[in-house]
């Protein structure tokens, strides 16, 4: 990468106090980690646990080393060398306007789907929970206090700011429990899903529009304090018979490789980085920590009872289909779930048939009683069909922590702590995703001659307009999703994983183009190897979801059409069938759209590489890389500064303070 700390970064070159503003490397590490590490490394591995923990662990470890962390670091590198330009801007500069039109449209749509999906997971966890609403709401003023404290009161005192934020965060969590137990205050903080959508949209607009240092950076750093340090243990897990390739790699997603990370690493984090040598620590290091989080999530899934796991992760329709003749409309959800599990042909590692069981207060409960006991222990009415992975992670984490901290009585506390833990990180990703979408919309509009000013990230009116458009896109899908179980974002959840991984292919292609054009072709294999693997996985998965007679969206639509035409459905069943039919066609069309768009982008990239090689025109001067500019700043390169770096840092700060006093 040939990083050089003597070269001024985008934060130093522009320094507009809003988008281009340097951040302490430790804070930026936390902010970047929180931005990329939303629900993905938690939910994906939990769902992939059904396919077996060994292949999941192998892909998380190998995938992050050779693909995920490589992508994040190299995208951060090429953007930092280009004044913090976004994915779309770099595609324009290196591959032409065709490239930017393709990737900007692709990225805006995928980001909107991702933000709506992640927000839906958070809202499901927060709805009707005054504890979660109060605690999460308090992170906003806490972040504002941290931002102002570090910028105005005690500049550069990161440890002091960290302690302040951590203490206030713990008080917010404890206060949330007190609020939930108060009969007067609890109703005030008890919000339904629609109310939470409105609150979340308003917050995200403000977070994306305000200066980065004021709210997003300290809040993301605050989120990191909650995520790092989770304990781990060993256990046996559930098994699942099915095709690991390609869907295991799609399901785990962010735990090993994610295209969304490339968007955050380009145009967002590079605008705040102090020195080029911090790129490896922030880009590669943050992704390594995220993969560790994915391992913890996988452990959380496999430490709970298999029967409880499947009862939580089967939808009502799946329970009915699996239970067969044992299903009863008059029975409780717990009874039907237990009946469905008893009919599943799944065995544990000892070869025993799976059953629903739960241990509480020294008693081992089985069947429906086990599900009732588990729900009672965490303070929920039911745990059946709590799909999405969030509840599974919270149960697993609480079940583990109660063994070491607090015993049986602490189960509910740790469960709600885990729910807030997840929701806080999800909302952090939504904050940054909105900002990423804003940049991409600006890039897209900037290609129109009369709207070129929108491509300037320092233009305030353009920032507000593009932020509104970005928020409206995912906010509308989210509101429709909470209003209709079959509409809005619910209809597009199935395509999220594949589209996100397709975006990774675009990231690797752009990096390859930049590497070749810079005359570093001998190192092109570094992005090319994961590019080839990612294309093989995602294109195979997309083809199967489009054309497979059993898994394909259009095959599902044909089956639903046949059921509707048979005349045997009526009432709610008929309405559900029509909604599912529309969703199947929508997912099929979008899958084709994403596949064609990414294939076209890869073709444009390949054409650019071939043209460069044939012309034998190489060098940084032929790329959009910024020319060298002597830096007047100093900052340590690693997370922990050396003794010499601390000495130079003190001298630099003293000199800077004297200059400020002299005006």
Features from the language model and the residues they span:
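Flexible loop linkers connecting adjacent transmembrane helices
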Residues: 1-21, 47, 61, 70-99, ...
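Membrane-interface "cap" regions at the ends of multi-pass membrane proteins
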Residues: 1-42, 224
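Transmembrane helix-loop junctions in multi-pass membrane proteins
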Residues: 41-42, 54, 113-128, 149-154, ...
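Extracellular loop-to-transmembrane helix junctions
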Residues: 48-79, 88, 131-143, 147, ...
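Loop-to-transmembrane helix boundary motifs in multi-pass membrane proteins
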Residues: 97-112, 285-292, 387-389, 408-418, ...
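Selective recognition of specific alpha-helical transmembrane segments in multi-pass small-molecule
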Residues: 107, 112-114, 167, 171-172, ...
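A generic transmembrane alpha-helix motif of multi-pass inner-membrane proteins
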Residues: 166-223, 242, 250, 477-645
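Low-complexity, proline/glycine-enriched hydrophobic segments characteristic of transmembrane helices
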Residues: 182, 306-404, 545-578
């Amino acid at each position: 990468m040939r990083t050089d700390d003597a070269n001024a970064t985008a934060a130093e070159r522009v320094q507009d106090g809003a988008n281009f503003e340097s951040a302490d490397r430790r804070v930026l590490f936390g902010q970047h980690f929180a931005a990329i590490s939303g629900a993905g490394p938690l939910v994906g591995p939990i769902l992939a646990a059904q396919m077996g923990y060994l292949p999941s662990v192998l892909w998380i470890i190998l995938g992050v080393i050779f693909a995920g962390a490589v992508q994040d670091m190299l995208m951060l590198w090429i953007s930092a060398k280009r004044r913090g330009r976004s994915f779309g801007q770099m595609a324009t500069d290196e591959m032409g306007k065709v490239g930017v039109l393709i990737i900007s449209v692709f990225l805006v749509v995928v980001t909107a789907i991702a933000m709506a999906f992640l927000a839906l997971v958070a809202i499901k966890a927060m709805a009707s929970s005054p504890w979660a609403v109060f605690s999460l709401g308090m992170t906003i003023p806490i972040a504002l206090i941290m931002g102002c404290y570090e910028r105005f009161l005690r500049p550069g005192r990161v440890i002091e700011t960290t302690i302040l934020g951590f203490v206030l965060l713990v008080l917010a969590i404890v206060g949330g429990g007190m609020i939930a137990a108060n009969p007067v205050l609890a109703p005030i903080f008890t919000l339904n899903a629609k109310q939470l959508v409105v609150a979340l949209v308003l917050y995200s607009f403000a977070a994306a529009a305000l200066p980065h240092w004021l709210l997003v950076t300290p809040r993301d750093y605050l989120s990191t304090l909650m995520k790092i340090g989770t304990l781990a243990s060993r256990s046996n897990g559930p098994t699942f018979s099915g095709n690991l390739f390609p869907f295991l790699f799609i399901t785990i997603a962010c735990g090993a490789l994610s295209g969304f990370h490339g968007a955050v690493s380009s145009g967002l984090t590079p605008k705040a980085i102090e020195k080029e040598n911090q790129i490896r620590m922030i880009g590669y290091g943050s992704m390594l920590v995220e993969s560790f989080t994915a391992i913890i999530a996988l452990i959380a899934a496999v430490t709970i009872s298999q029967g409880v796991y499947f009862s939580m992760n089967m939808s009502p329709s799946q329970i009915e289909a699996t239970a067969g003749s044992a299903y009863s409309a008059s029975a409780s959800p717990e009874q039907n779930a237990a009946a469905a599990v008893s009919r599943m042909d799944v065995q544990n590692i000892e070869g025993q048939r799976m059953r629903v069981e739960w241990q509480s207060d020294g008693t081992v409960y089985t069947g429906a009683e086990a599900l009732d006991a588990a729900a009672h222990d965490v303070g929920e009415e039911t745990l059946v069909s709590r799909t999405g992975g969030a509840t599974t992670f919270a149960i697993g984490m609480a079940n583990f922590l109660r063994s070491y901290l607090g015993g049986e009585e602490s189960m509910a506390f740790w469960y709600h702590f885990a729910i807030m833990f997840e929701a806080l990180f999800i909302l952090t990703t939504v904050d940054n995703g909105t900002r990423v979408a804003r940049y991409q919309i600006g890039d897209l509009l900037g290609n129109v001659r009369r709207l070129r000013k929108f491509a300037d990230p320092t233009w305030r009116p353009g920032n507000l307009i593009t932020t509104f458009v970005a928020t409206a896109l995912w906010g509308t899908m989210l509101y429709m999703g909470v209003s209709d179980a079959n509409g809005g974002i619910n209809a597009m959840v199935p395509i999220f994983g594949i589209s996100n991984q397709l975006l990774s292919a675009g990231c690797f292609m752009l990096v390859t183009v930049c590497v070749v054009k810079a005359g570093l072709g001998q190192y092109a294999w570094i992005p090319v190897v994961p590019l080839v693997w990612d294309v093989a996985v995602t294109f195979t998965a997309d083809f199967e979801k489009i054309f497979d007679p059993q898994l394909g969206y259009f095959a599902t639509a044909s089956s639903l059409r046949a059921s509707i035409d048979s005349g045997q459905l009526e009432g709610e069943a008929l309405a559900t069938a029509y909604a599912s039919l529309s969703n199947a066609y929508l997912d099929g069309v979008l899958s084709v759209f994403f596949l064609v768009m990414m294939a076209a982008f890869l073709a444009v990239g390949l054409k650019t590489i071939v043209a460069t090689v044939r012309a034998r025109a190489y060098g940084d001067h032929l790329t959009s890389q910024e020319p060298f500019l002597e830096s007047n700043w100093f900052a340590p390169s690693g997370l922990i500064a050396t003794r010499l770096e601390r000495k130079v840092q003190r001298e630099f700060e003293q000199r800077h303070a004297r200059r400020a006093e002299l005006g």
